[in-house]
Amino acid sequence: MSNLLVQVSKTGPSSVLQVITKEIPKPAPNGLVIKNAYAGLNYIDTYLRTGLYTAPLPYIPGKEAAGVVAAVGDKVEADFKVGDRVVYLTPFGAYAQYTNVPTTLVSKVSEKIPLKIASAALLQGLTAYTLIEEAYPVKTGDTVVVHAAAGGVGLLLCQMLRARNVHVIATASTAAKRRIAIKNGAEIACSYEDLTKVVADYTNGKGVDAAYDSVGIDTLSSSLDALRNGGTMVSFGNASGAIDAIPLKFLSARCLKFVRPSLFGYITGHAVFEGYVSRLWKEILDNNLNIAIHHIFKLSEAKEAHDAIESRATTGKLLLLCNEDLADA
């Protein structure tokens, strides 16, 4: 049997994504081979592909997937067996039919949760948790800005923040996206260009407690301008381009804080990972979180999937279907 996968041998546009075939990997002694049902797409996949972030070449993209255990290493002590339904996080390797991963960031999935939902929820759900509990821990009554609020993380942030009685001012590029943000928990939604005025009106000139910004350079100024004295900007993406540096004078005058978090910096081991994942599954099963999937591409359509996410025209999550026989698992 062969293993269809996507490989990047040089950095560049989406055309550098090569679909190739290799042998199915054998499990490492302390690892699992996962037969992937779905791999999740994330903006960081494009940052690595373009060279904005460094990756060892050649590499297989993809940081998350859901599937079933196909093989278990002979030294694995954790409770995994062939056939288990699982999700996992990995530095690289999810854009493949089969992936060899250590057990550290692998978690079982309830039979009640379809694997496509589990894959769509995992990385972005955990990202949203860490943004509002670690990067800037929100409090009841806070007012925050969520940029790109109709994207995968943005929609989850709106829902989680509403559940915590936090007031959300959302930004999105179109009226349709702004309506989606309102439906998912934002109190008010506006264009990127109107944010400064909307924040001033909504907060009576005080400013917001925090701004969660995945857009990058295009919204840097408006995010900082929106903050109250002592407010916090949480920068967690570069969809419009990277922020190279921030002069300290932009922060010092109003005692602003700037945070650049990383999910993998917070997920420090299996216990932490399992704690977040178990909460995520409970919220999904309790119908407290709506997981929006924008489109599912075939694994061989990775280029088209990257083009779609980079267009910034999507809402919710993009997935790659890795094994068609697991499409309904």
From Swiss-Prot:
Cellular location(s): Cytoplasm; Nucleus
GO biological processes: cellular detoxification
Regions that span the bilayer: none
Reaction(s) this enzyme catalyzes, per UniProt: 2 a quinone + NADPH + H(+) = 2 a 1,4-benzosemiquinone + NADP(+)
PANTHER family referenced in this protein's UniProt entry, alphabetically: QUINONE OXIDOREDUCTASE PIG3-RELATED (PTHR48106), QUINONE OXIDOREDUCTASE-RELATED (PTHR48106:SF13)
Main location: cytoplasm
UniProt entry keywords in alphabetical sequence: Cytoplasm, NADP, Nucleus, Oxidoreductase, Phosphoprotein
Organism of provenance: Schizosaccharomyces pombe (strain 972 / ATCC 24843) (Fission yeast)
EC code(s) of this entry: 1.6.5.5
Gene name of the record: zta1
Modified residues (Phosphoserine): S191
Stated name of the protein: Probable quinone oxidoreductase
GO cellular component assignments: cytosol; nucleus
Family to which the UniProt record says this protein belongs: Belongs to the zinc-containing alcohol dehydrogenase family. Quinone oxidoreductase subfamily.
MF terms (GO), sorted A to Z: mRNA 3'-UTR AU-rich region binding; NADPH binding; NADPH:quinone reductase activity
